[in-house]
Amino acid sequence: MSPILGYWKIKGLVQPTRLLLEYLEEKYEEHLYERDEGDKWRNKKFELGLEFPNLPYYIDGDVKLTQSMAIIRYIADKHNMLGGCPKERAEISMLEGAVLDIRYGVSRIAYSKDFETLKVDFLSKLPEMLKMFEDRLCHKTYLNGDHVTHPDFMLYDALDVVLYMDPMCLDAFPKLVCFKKRIEAIPQIDKYLKSSKYIAWPLQGWQATFGGGDHPPK
């Protein structure tokens, strides 16, 4: 039986996990909850055998996980992608945290009615965060070298999100522009992005001021 990935029918916290699974060509079944299916999830959440019931969840045989980072790390670990030595494992963990500084930074303001005001401060700090990744990629194909690791998909997702906030935010970062195109050119990812499985919108929950609703801004 294929593993089950359960989440809202949005990008949200689980999009990097979807990208990783597609890259690995690992068969999985998605249980997607629509905008109006909150009651469906609440009625089901305690019937799945999850120790800490929440969305997203991942069920792989007797392994039943929640929390997005636990899920993506588990999948990476299954495929020996967490690093071959303590230094490499620590660097991969560091990269996770650095990407989450951007992604969670967006999420913290995305639901506020004062988003437009808060966005100004976020965008003023964004170049400093992006420059660190630009420098990291100066002599690397991917964040950890020549091989893809899960923080690459986390960064790809974060870049996708901030480009909706400011379409010119990568103009000063050619390495990041190339990195994003490189991820999209991976055959498995290219196929996924063009498939009906790909969820383009919303970026956040439907109720979010930024990245919410049923359709992207024109």
UniProtKB/Swiss-Prot annotation:
Tell me one Pfam family matched here: GST_N
Q: Can you tell me which residues bind substrate?
A: 111
Q: Does the keyword Kinase apply?
A: no
One GO molecular function term?
glutathione transferase activity
List, in alphabetical order, the GO biological process terms annotated in this UniProt record: glutathione metabolic process
What are the UniProt keywords, alphabetically?
Answer: Transferase
| InterPro entries in UniProt | Glutathione-S-Trfase_C-like, Glutathione-S-Trfase_C_sf, Glutathione_S-Trfase, Glutathione_S-Trfase_N, GST_C, GST_superfamily, Thioredoxin-like_sf
The record places domain GST N-terminal at 2-83
Which residues does the annotation say bind glutathione? 7-8, 41-45, 54-55, 67-68
* Top enzyme class: transferase
EC assignment: 2.5.1.18
Query: Its catalytic activity?
Result: RX + glutathione = an S-substituted glutathione + a halide anion + H(+)
Ranges of residues in domain GST C-terminal:
85-203
PANTHER family for this protein: GLUTATHIONE S-TRANSFERASE, GLUTATHIONE TRANSFERASE
Q: Which family does it belong to?
A: Belongs to the GST superfamily. Mu family.
Known function:
Conjugation of reduced glutathione to a wide number of exogenous and endogenous hydrophobic electrophiles.
Q: What else is known?
A: There are at least two isoenzymes of GST in S.japonicum.
Quaternary state and interactors: Homodimer.
Name it. Glutathione S-transferase class-mu 26 kDa isozyme
Organism of derivation: Schistosoma japonicum
